[in-house]
Every structure is written in structure tokens, then in C-alpha cells.
Design a protein with these regions (language model features):
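An alpha-helical, amphipathic repeat domain used for nucleic-acid recognition
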Residues: 1-128
């Protein structure tokens, strides 16, 4: 009989593991969905840098995996676009009288490449 009890306990343990895995997957999917909605909300207000969004979502309590998945979806859908952010940031900074080096340094801290030379020329014509 001891063997039967052990087998039954093993079956219960397996069921618990299976059900907790399903819960974790569902929970991750729900968390990712909430993180994606937060990205949509923030991106609808103004352009967002991927790194800043990542930091904000982690600070707001989302898991690394949920943030990475949601941010990946937003980037794939062009909701978040670091190149577009860089150009908007550049124009804003130049309009405020800031110089090119300062803008480039700020973008480097966000791991964003500097806008193209053509974008700089257009911005200088408009604000410079």
C-alpha cells in the first residue's frame, strides 16, 4: 500500500505542477497585455524611446519578460520607433537652442543612433 500512496501523491504533485504552469503562462500573457496597453497609452501622448519605456515599465512593477515581449510587439508594430524618437528629440532640442553634441550625447545614453545627416540639415534649416 505504501507504494500506491506514493504513486497517488506523485500524481497530485504532477497535477499541481501542470496547473501552476498554466497559471504562470496565463499570468504572463495578462501582464504582457497590460504592459502593451501602458505602452500604447504613453506612446499616444508623445514619442517614446524604447529604453525609457523599458525602464518605466520595470519601475511600474512589470516583469522583465512581460516588458520585453510587450516592447517587442510595440516595436514590430512601429508604435515605438527609436529613429522617429531621435528625430523628434533632435528637433525639440534644437528649437530650445541646444547644440548637436548635446543632442547626440543624450541619444547615446538611450542607445539610440544619431539622426541621419539629412535629418540634421533639415532641422538646422528649420531651427538653426
Amino acid at each position: 500500500m505504501a507504494t500506491l500512496v506514493d504513486i497517488e501523491q506523485l500524481k497530485r504533485n504532477i497535477r499541481e505542477i501542470d496547473s501552476s504552469s498554466v497559471y504562470e503562462e496565463t499570468s504572463l500573457a495578462e501582464e504582457e497585455s497590460k504592459a502593451f496597453k501602458k505602452i500604447l497609452k504613453l506612446a499616444s501622448i508623445r514619442e517614446q524611446a524604447g529604453k525609457k519605456l523599458h525602464e518605466r515599465l520595470i519601475k511600474d512593477g512589470f516583469s522583465e519578460q512581460a516588458v520585453s515581449n510587450a516592447l517587442g510587439r510595440a516595436i514590430d508594430a512601429h508604435i515605438v520607433d527609436d529613429e522617429r524618437y531621435a528625430e523628434a528629440f533632435m528637433r525639440t532640442q534644437l528649437a530650445q537652442g541646444k547644440g548637436r553634441r548635446g543632442v547626440e550625447r543624450a541619444l547615446e545614453q538611450l542607445y539610440i543612433d544619431s539622426p541621419s545627416e539629412e535629418a540634421w540639415q533639415l532641422a538646422y534649416e528649420q531651427f538653426g
